[in-house]
Amino acid sequence: MKMAQVTIRTAVFDKEVSFYRDVVGLKTVHELQEGLLHIVFLSNGEGETCIEVIDQSDAGTTCNPYLSIGFRTADASRLRQELMQKGYEPSPMASPAPAVQFFFVKDPAGVTVQFVEGGF
């Protein structure tokens, strides 16, 4: 079995899609827009696990405080600086082991996103 997607329902749909496309670097692999329904699937490529973003204007700004999504990056320090320049408020860098460093940042919908360099 392979994981298909992680779904985020949000009132800030355009900002959310932009975050995962422009900051994380995912590509739109499928988009569905019919009437009031608007869904975008983003991933690293066809057949890969997707972030499914659903436009839900009544979703408010709250999200599951325990949800966290992690991405690997080649240079966590550089990405953290870029996010700060764009107005995001990333956590301090953490390094629980010599070959691992990471930080967290909230996406526009309030989901905690971790960017990890190194690791397993």
Model-derived regions: residue spans:
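Short amphipathic alpha-helices within nucleic acid-binding modules
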Residues: F19, S77-E82
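Short, charged/polar, Gly/Pro-enriched secondary-structure boundary elements
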Residues: G47-I51, T61, G110-V113
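Core segments of cupin and vicinal oxygen chelate
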Residues: T7-E48
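Short beta-strand micro-motifs in enzyme catalytic cores
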Residues: H38-V40, L67, A99-F103
